[in-house]
Each structure stands twice: as C-alpha cells, then as structure tokens.
C-alpha cells in the first residue's frame, strides 16, 4: 500500500483507487464519487451494503453542486447548513437525478459535509471535486484511529494511505436533515 501526502493522491483517486485518509475524528475510506466501480470496491472492502448510502466530503459547497439539488431547499435551509460549515456537521440534502445509486443508496437524498480538516480540504481541492467518505472499518467494527490500524486492516485491499493527522474531534459528525432540521445523529 502506498503511503502518500494529499497532493500526491489525485491520480490514484481519479483512476479508480480507494484510499484511507485522516479526517476530523477517525480515518476515512474514500474514492471518486463519479466512478461506480471505485464506489463498489470501497463498499466491498468495508463490507457495507450499497443500500445504506455514503457521505460526500468537500472543501466547499460549490464542489457539491453536481450532486445536491439545491432547488429543493429554501434559502433558510441552505443558510443553516452554511452557518455550520466548514465543520463537523453532515447534512442530508436532496439529490440530482444523475447521482449514482451507490452514493445515495435507497434514498432520494445524499449526506454531504464541508470539512474543516486541512488534509481533507487539500484532497478535495487537488481532486477539484468531493470525495466519498465513510469511516475506515469493517461494518460493525470500530473505526481506525491510527495509520498502523489502517496498515494492519487494509493492506492489499486499498490503494493508498494518505499521511496526516486526525483532527481534534472525538465523535463522528452530527447528521442533520436539511429539509426538516431534524438531528438524525448527535455527534461532536
């Protein structure tokens, strides 16, 4: 498994690779959100059913516009999300028609976050698009907190490990339904 800095990851991701990378709280697994083969590989590595959907993480909201149907949200709903970003808040938003079922699962919405983590922002800026994000663990297991855990659990299963530090968060992000304002998962 390659161990690289965020700036060196672009070609791996855009060519269908699956990576592990540090986020605000835990290591994440990620891939190109526009590559169904890469998404299916990520789901297989994690042993996660596609029906559950995945999160997209971005460096800014503009990167999410190809996936989120903002026309279904009011100005107030968008302003609420913008007031929490960048930060540890994931919003469930309506999807555009062309979004892959492997991203949204059985839902008519997608979970999105604008990250405050410098490494995640650097990855997304290098890709010029969001990154699929899910915790680096097998379904039902605890997420990886160290590079050593990634190497032990995912060598031979993923293409690269992004070097860097975890953020200060110790809980997963809070998930909020952007349309209703309902908290779906309390984090932080």
From Swiss-Prot:
Domain YrdC-like: 3-188
An MF annotation (GO) of this entry: L-threonylcarbamoyladenylate synthase
Entry protein name: Threonylcarbamoyl-AMP synthase
Role played: Required for the formation of a threonylcarbamoyl group on adenosine at position 37 (t(6)A37) in tRNAs that read codons beginning with adenine. Catalyzes the conversion of L-threonine, HCO(3)(-)/CO(2) and ATP to give threonylcarbamoyl-AMP (TC-AMP) as the acyladenylate intermediate, with the release of diphosphate.
GO cellular component, as recorded: cytoplasm
The UniProt record lists the keyword Nucleotidyltransferase: yes
Coiled-coil segments: none
Family classification: Belongs to the SUA5 family. TsaC subfamily.
Catalytic function, reaction form: L-threonine + hydrogencarbonate + ATP = L-threonylcarbamoyladenylate + diphosphate + H2O
SUPFAM superfamilies on file: YrdC/RibB
Pfam family, any one: Sua5_yciO_yrdC
Biological source species: Shewanella sp. (strain W3-18-1)
Main location: cytoplasm
Cross-referenced InterPro entries: DHBP_synth_RibB-like_a/b_dom (IPR017945), Sua5-like_dom (IPR006070), TC-AMP_synthase (IPR023535), TC-AMP_synthase_SUA5 (IPR050156)
Keyword tRNA processing: yes
Family matches, as PANTHER family: SUA5, THREONYLCARBAMOYL-AMP SYNTHASE
Subcellular location per the Swiss-Prot or TrEMBL entry: Cytoplasm
GO biological process assignments: regulation of translational fidelity; tRNA threonylcarbamoyladenosine modification
Broad enzyme group: transferase
EC numbers on record: 2.7.7.87
Top-level taxon of the source organism: Bacteria
Keywords: ATP-binding, Cytoplasm, Nucleotide-binding, Nucleotidyltransferase, Transferase, tRNA processing
Gene name as annotated: tsaC
